[in-house]
A protein has these predicted regions:
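C-terminal motif of bacterial Sec signal peptides marking the signal peptidase cleavage site
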Residues: 12-15
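Residues within mature, well-folded domains
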Residues: 17-213
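Sec-dependent signal peptide recognition
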Residues: 2-8
Length: 213
């Protein structure tokens, strides 16, 4: 058993040291990219579980790709924060390129964020998940769930990691809205998403419609 575990560690380390596919680094360095979603970090290296701990790089943060390996990408934000994100858990379900293409995107998520209701916008900015959120809003807030436990985002149940020991689940209803958040702790305040209030009609002027003499 120890030998099998050791082999697994050796394979993982070897994958980290392998270069990215030819041309992939140059492709990402030539593009204007930003983070798809909120990314949490405690150190300068995190993984695709995106634990809900530490500081946050907000969704839509512009980044410059510095380096890539067979299962990691290193980037720097405009503010100078350098972070390496390792594709640790989902590498058997999706390729390095598929994963990076989800993590770093060309279309600014902030433009889409601005179309959400005010309560949904606040939840995303605070990295929360609340009942009534759409799949898109949950991804922007929490990131993509690791694919080794959530094979597809069309599933009605997603598994996330609060930290390296604790998981929680996000369940969706048939309309694609969050119905339940199961597990504790979890990044929720139990405040269901509310639609924005309808604007109050402007009263018509008393002189409106009168003919001029």
């Amino acid at each position: 058993m120890r030998r099998i575990a050791l082999i697994g560690v050796v394979v993982f380390v070897a994958a980290c040291k392998q270069p990215a596919p030819p041309g992939l680094l140059q492709e990402y360095q030539s593009r204007s990219l930003m983070t798809c979603c909120n990314i949490h970090y405690e150190t300068d290296q995190v993984n695709d579980a995106n634990y809900f701990v530490g500081s946050t790089i907000p969704a839509g943060t512009p980044v410059k790709v510095d380096a890539m390996t067979g299962n990691s990408v290193t980037f720097t934000t405009a503010e100078g924060k350098k972070l390496t994100v390792v594709h640790s858990y989902g590498r058997d379900q999706e390729s390095m390129q598929q994963w990076v293409s989800k993590l770093l995107v060309a279309d600014d998520p902030k433009a889409k964020l601005a179309t959400f209701s005010k309560s949904a916008q606040q939840a995303v900015r605070e990295g929360r998940v609340e009942k009534g959120m759409t799949r898109e809003q949950v991804i922007m807030s929490l990131g993509y769930p690791p694919t080794h436990r959530t094979a597809s985002t069309t599933s009605n149940e997603w598994t996330y990691w609060y930290n390296r020991w604790v998981t929680y689940k996000v369940q969706f209803d048939d309309q694609g809205l969050v119905a339940n958040v199961i597990g504790s702790p979890a990044p929720t305040q139990n405040q269901p998403i509310q639609p924005d209030p309808k604007p109050v009609p402007t009263p018509k002027s008393a002189s409106h419609g009168k003919k001029r003499k």
